[in-house]
């Protein structure tokens, strides 16, 4: 949607928050 920081990092490339994905900065965001 808009880029929303999920307050989660994803050093292993996995986001545990529903709907969140790992971006190239290793931060989980929601579309």
Curated annotation (Swiss-Prot):
InterPro entries: Cyclotide (IPR005535), Cyclotide_sf (IPR036146). The lineage of its organism: Eukaryota, Viridiplantae, Streptophyta, Embryophyta, Tracheophyta. Probably participates in a plant defense mechanism. Inhibits the cytopathic effects of the human immunodeficiency virus. Has no hemolytic activity. Keywords: Disulfide bond, Knottin, Plant defense. Belongs to the cyclotide family. Bracelet subfamily. This is Kalata-B8. The keyword Disulfide bond applies. There is a cross-link at residues 1-31 (Cyclopeptide (Gly-Asp)). The keyword Ribosomal protein does not apply. The presence of a 'disulfide through disulfide knot' structurally defines this protein as a knottin. It comes from Oldenlandia affinis. One of its GO terms (biological process) is defense response. Disulfide bonds join 6-20, 10-22, 15-28. It holds the Pfam family Cyclotide. This is a cyclic peptide.
